[in-house]
Amino acid sequence: EVNEMVNFKTGSVRRFFVQTERPGLGDMTESMAAHAHREIDPASEVETSVGWCGFWDERVADPTQFDVNLVGFGFRVDTLKVPNAVLAPKTRDACEALKQELKLDSLNRQQIADVRAQVKQQLRLRIPPRTQVTQVVWSEDEKDVVYLMTGSDAVAAQFHELFERTFD
């Protein structure tokens, strides 16, 4: 697959030229459902979730048939990461509280690491994931072209990997 980027005044579009033939809408829906976006469990250590979603609705993985040769769908990336600007002061406060509770002058590295892990886990339960949805259009007109509406190399790489797992 070849990845080209075209810049516009308000955004970028990447074109992927695919060798595989586009499946029918029913087969495409089935393939996308197998790799649909899944919510991140805040109790887990997972920080990123990547999957397909709808063109208009990020909660479902249904492709939209625009005309005979164009099908649109979404590529969704969720990231659940506690910002260090939030984690550091909360960890300091929790360490101070633990020192007072245990009547200690200081905590050792292991105690600080344990407090940091507990604070991070508590914050993950309260902080919503950052969601990024990128529209995708698959055209059969010119050499089976897939358009990805992004200028980000990282998003393009994640898309390419998921696309190959789903449709190859």
Residue ranges and their predicted role:
Residues V2-M28:
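N-terminal alpha-helical "arm" segments
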Residues A154-D168:
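A short alpha->loop->secondary-structure connector
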Residues V2-F8, P63-T64, R130-E142, E161:
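Short, flexible, solvent-exposed loop/turn segments with mixed acidic/basic and small polar residues
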Residues G26-Q135:
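Surface-exposed, low-hydrophobicity interaction/linker segments
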Residues R14-F16, F73, E142-T150:
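Short cationic amphipathic helices and targeting signals
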Residues E21-P23, R76-V82, D141, D153:
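Generic structural motif
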